[in-house]
Amino acid sequence: MSFTVAALGNREACAQFNPNGMEGAKRKNLDRPVSLMSLAVRQGVDSAELRGLCYNRFQADITIECPQMPAKGTLIKAGELTLGILLEGKACWPECVLFQENLPCPLIDGVRYAWVENPGTLCLGEVFEVVASDNPA
């Protein structure tokens, strides 16, 4: 499975990634250096009428176009950059209206966090490929 880079959080054509994440990005949790979001979820969040608490807060470092997000425990690579998808996922907040009304939140399945296995530069249109996975396909 492949994942095409549709947008970068710095709104530039390319970004540099080091072991701490995307250079210049603000990090809320140092244990989750890189955040990824699917393009379909990004578009859904942007056009939603009922907005969850995280809709305005969450900023993805990388937006990827893909039929489904990379599995947790997977290593993905684009050029020299290799990311490892963390097992930790996006959590819900009790004060969120979606959580309170038991409504689905697209961020739960449409967001992944990753560590930088091998630093490198990533540009729009580049394609991540799975290079290793803990999950048999």
Describe each region flagged by the PLM.
Residues 77-79, 100, 129-131:
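Short intrinsically disordered coil segments
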Residues 82-86, 104-117:
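Active-site scaffold segments
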Residues 51-59, 96-111:
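Short, basic/aromatic beta-hairpin or loop at an interaction surface
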Residues 1-94, 121, 134-136:
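Electropositive, beta-rich accessory/interaction domains or terminal extensions
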Residues 112-137:
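Well-ordered alpha/beta subsegment
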